[in-house]
Amino acid sequence: MNTTYLSAITRPQSILVATDLNDLDFLLPVAIDQAKMTGAMIWLLHVIPPEAYVSIESGAYPFVAKEKEYRSAEAVLAEVALELRQRNLACASEVRRLYPVDEIKGFIREHSVKRLIVGTSARGKLGKLLIGSVAEQLIRSLDIPVCTVGPHFEAPAPNRPHRILFAVSLRHHPEHSLRFAVDLAAASAAELTILHVAEQDLGDEGLAAGAMSRIEELLRQIEPMLVRPHIRVRSGEPAEEIVAECMASEPQLLVLSAFQASPLSATFRAGVAYRVIAQVPCPTFTLPSGSKARPSGTYREFSTAQAGSSHSGQF
């Protein structure tokens, strides 16, 4: 594991909040919490897409409409940045034009940003919450942690126990995402639960124990271990079980284990990560990886001893 890379993503010097301005109410509390935890500077970025200028309101003077939109966005972000600085949080803002995904990725490269916070607020024809196209493309293509936040997010009460849920897949090497989750929990003095969901396979009674053993083995590789994680193994459909666990335990953060990044939106939308992000009520970190784990002779991924069963323990 590259320790320099790990340190950069777990303790970033700057955090980028990519906002459409309508989502600031639920993005800012998350950004503030993470900035306080890491000491990072907050960047606020709004990108005005080309279609924003093609409207009835722009009429015969599209240039005037462009400048009005730009100045208005600048004023909003400047006011927010000032408020954060008055709260002793380092913050700066910028407004750009053209295509949001390209501009956000360009900004990340230019400023060496190691963490992105973005909203997920698109809705389908039946009103079902989906991941907006900008957030979806960023999740699929970036190699830094992306924290997605939905409009249903509510800041937890101050006296509420701080919990982090790490949903681990053993199909892909989860080492750096596991360490990321452990470091998040240690930095915020949070209770960490590691959840592995195995699809039903009634013929292998030792597989739940095998998954537990594999997770414990991964944890032993982390030094120093500053938290004592709880380990849970459940059976069922992975996305459904992860969402159910979030609803039951109400974590402040969800970390999804490394999943294979795909340039194809159809492939991503069919996967566990997309369905979980679109449904859970808490901010969710994703850390993509294209590296698959080799099959083990004693443990086969995504199967368990008994349908509907769960196993738990503490490391």
Region annotations inferred by a language model:
Residues 90-94, 228-231:
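Rossmann-fold cofactor-recognition segment
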Residues 1-7, 134-153, 211:
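Extended, non-globular alpha-helical segments
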Residues 95-103, 234-241:
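Charged docking surfaces used in two-component/phosphorelay signaling
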Residues 115-137, 253-279, 293-297:
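Glycine-rich, Arg-bearing micro-motifs that act as flexible, cationic patches
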Residues 118-120, 145-152, 257, 284-288:
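Short beta-strand elements of ligand-binding domains
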Residues 2-62, 162-207, 220-230, 251, ...:
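Small/aliphatic-rich secondary-structure junction motif
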Residues 107-113, 247-251:
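Glycine-rich phosphate-binding loop signature in dinucleotide/nucleotide-binding domains
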